[in-house]
Amino acid sequence: MNKASEAEAVLPELLRFADGTAVAAPAAWPRRRKEIADLIVDIEYGGLPPTPAETTLETLHLSSVRGLEGVRFLSGRVQTGPDRPFAFLLTLLLPPGDGPFPVVLTGDACWRYVTDAVAADVLGRGFILAQFNRTEIAPDVYSDARSSGIYRVYPEGAYGALSAWAWGYHRCLDALVGQPFVDASRIAVTGHSRGGKTVLLAGATDERIALTAANNSGAGGAGCFRRQGPQSETLGDLMRNLAYWFGPKLRAYVGREAELPFDQ
């Protein structure tokens, strides 16, 4: 890396407010945290969809699971409302016993549900495995990006698909935390690639999430926009091919990544 590149790769100072003053004590961190979050949510993601007044979980089906003694399968409907209602499916595999159990939640069921081996491992550790299809919340198709899902319910705003999918995780949290079999203090979220980008946003904007486990989230996730290794995903790549994941303001920083007031 040459000297010019080194200068451009300097990351924004985490413990300094936008006005230049230092975060001098732990008590000041929540204010700085909110400052960073507000910038990122606005510039990178185009905001977040509105939070509904209420969210419920309706049980559609509950049964035992053949070959897994004591394990139960619950298929439920997450329903928001009362104004501008929206619903999507959430499935749970519950370990033996009454709980309350910790939860591993993933929205990557759009690709495929987890394998039997992974499910058995999660259940064997005494965790609930919760899964939903994030493309029920917003489509993952460039040419049809705002035609269905919550875009029909909340057409206002400039939020991209990542914000919509993160909203889905938040509504699952709403539905789960009041259940007697759920340990609301131990809920983890996980996702891969674009799902990893999604859970990083979901975890950063909902402190009920105890653990965020993102896998291969790339640029716009755990990877930097400023610092790039060989064949890294870049902001330019994202804007050329997948701009609908993000808010419209981010495009202005292609080739000007060093001017972003944050990096991730």
State the predicted function of each range.
Residues 1-88:
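N-terminal targeting or regulatory segments adjacent to alpha/beta-hydrolase or S9 domains
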Residues 83-88, 94-103:
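Proline/glycine-enriched tight loop/beta-turn segments at coil->beta junctions
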Residues 132, 190-192, 212-217:
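Generic beta-strand/beta-sheet core signal
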Residues 191-202:
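Glycine-rich nucleophile elbow surrounding the catalytic serine of serine-hydrolase chemistry
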Residues 214-264:
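Mobile cap/lid helix-loop segments that gate and shape the active-site cleft of serine hydrolases
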